[in-house]
């Protein structure tokens, strides 16, 4: 919002300088006041030059993590296209209007009587995402990060596939951006928490949290880069039909939710296998101890008889 109004008042170059200065100051403040969690285990490698410090070659043997990487890749494939194309969709359908760089608003014969600035739709979506980011932390503590992440991603996909495609009035558009904004905040903020959920409570495993999170985002980076480009090409190819990007984004997020469900299933299967293995180990230990006691008692009895 700040950049939008500054460009109109002082020009693009000066507006970028003001916003960049504010960004530097806020990031510097975060660096000074942020403190690491003393309870979190940190790895201390002997040298940072080894590949194993940056890439855990055994990570993808964990099926739950592999499914999560696929889920985040599909998520980024379609998620950002919603934000990149929202204003263009609003202007094309007459729900909103875009400002003319020379002043005033661009002419649009489809403009609805109660149309609003298309920019405000994106601002509302970004603002309501704060609700999802904050509330998801509470929900994860009670229901598990992966479970919450899967549900909010599924809901976000359904909102895109159903509500966005049917929105043809300003009120419907506002309803979509508010609801999608709330769930998008949770969707985009929970991947690191999902990685922590997969690693489990073991301190040795939690020490790999940063490494595995970086690997996950590295896998998804290519999809985050190409997804909006593909969505834009679909709009152009089908003559400004924004149903293409709506279906593209919704389908990608739906597949992402399915991959998250598979990740949850793999995690539960792994935990069940570990639980049965531990039970068998304890049962074997108890059985061995009882056999040893029986043999000891038998030897004592034989000596007494002698």
Label every PLM stretch briefly.
Residues 1, 186-205:
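Intracellular juxtamembrane helix-capping segments at the cytosolic ends
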Residues 41-69, 280-304:
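Juxtamembrane intracellular "pre-TM" segments in multi-pass secondary transporters
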Residues 1-11, 90-91, 139-143, 228-240:
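Interfacial helix-cap and linker-helix signal at transmembrane-aqueous boundaries
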Residues 199-240:
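A late C-terminal transmembrane helix in Major Facilitator Superfamily
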Residues 29-35, 247-306:
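Multi-pass alpha-helical transporter architecture, strongest
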Residues 112, 117-119, 123-135, 140-194, ...:
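C-terminal transmembrane helical hairpin of 12-TM major facilitator-type secondary transporters
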Residues 61-150, 227-231:
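Extracytoplasmic gate region of multi-pass secondary transporters
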Residues 1-38:
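Helix-loop-helix hairpin linking two adjacent transmembrane segments in secondary transporters
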